[in-house]
Amino acid sequence: MRTSSFLDRLISEVDSALRTLVLPPKRITTRQSPAENLADTVLSAQEKKHISGLMRVNHAGEVCAQALYQGQALTAQLTHIKEQMASAAAEEVDHLAWCEERLYELGSKPSLLNPIWYCGSVLLGALAGLAGDKVSLGFVAETERQVTAHLQRHLHYLPEKDKKTIAILKRMQEDEEHHAHTAMEAGAVELPYIIKQLMNAVSKLMTQSSYYI
């Protein structure tokens, strides 16, 4: 049986990048949006603007997560780790679709900075993979912990009447917690404090810029 070469994986990565960054009219998902059967809520122009900013940040975060997983799958050493990264990336596609759909409903669009975040995250993921599978899984666990905390903050910032966005973020939060738990069970190592702080600083830069652009 023919084994996957680095070139094969690189071509797959380019394909994944295009699928992530080039926005289709409607992205194909494996799961229905949590907001699918919820009624629309009357929102003021200011509320729509604020919610759009938050969802633009969440969408950018999912772009980063997708890229991180793809980069790690590119250099992961063990087959089951590669498969785990690919599975997690597939769930992140659902998150991308849900965020995109909600943005369009609000009359907005994703961040123009997404290509920058994607490239940086792919590089980080690939470097983490080269450092070893346990380190790579450590990046997954820490990334998902930070994303979970970030989603929790956004849930506090949303108007209570915006049931659609709340439902989406809660489901995303559940998935991210599961990804972190799975990574730890698979043997993730705890990252050094300085690395966690650096990741947090980059995350803040992404959130503050993507809210507006």
From Swiss-Prot:
The gene coding this protein: coq7
UniProt keyword annotations, A-Z: Cell membrane, Iron, Membrane, Metal-binding, Monooxygenase, Oxidoreductase, Ubiquinone biosynthesis
Function per UniProt: Catalyzes the hydroxylation of 2-nonaprenyl-3-methyl-6-methoxy-1,4-benzoquinol during ubiquinone biosynthesis.
GO CC, any one term: plasma membrane
Cofactor requirement: Fe cation
Record note on cofactor: Binds 2 iron ions per subunit.
Catalytic activity, as annotated: a 5-methoxy-2-methyl-3-(all-trans-polyprenyl)benzene-1,4-diol + AH2 + O2 = a 3-demethylubiquinol + A + H2O
Enzyme class: oxidoreductase
SUPFAM superfamilies for this protein: Ferritin-like
EC number assigned by the record: 1.14.99.60
Primary site of residence: membrane
Record carries keyword Transmembrane: no
Topology with respect to the bilayer: Peripheral membrane protein
Protein name: 3-demethoxyubiquinol 3-hydroxylase
GO biological process: ubiquinone biosynthetic process
A Pfam family that the UniProt record links to this protein: COQ7
Residues reported in the UniProt entry to bind Fe cation 2: E92, E144, E176, H179
GO molecular function: 3-demethoxyubiquinol 3-hydroxylase activity; metal ion binding
Naturally occurring in which organism (per UniProt): Legionella pneumophila (strain Paris)
Pathways per UniProt: Cofactor biosynthesis; ubiquinone biosynthesis
Positions contributing to Fe cation 1 binding: E62, E92, H95, E176
Localization terms from the record: Cell membrane
HAMAP family: COQ7
Family from the record: Belongs to the COQ7 family.
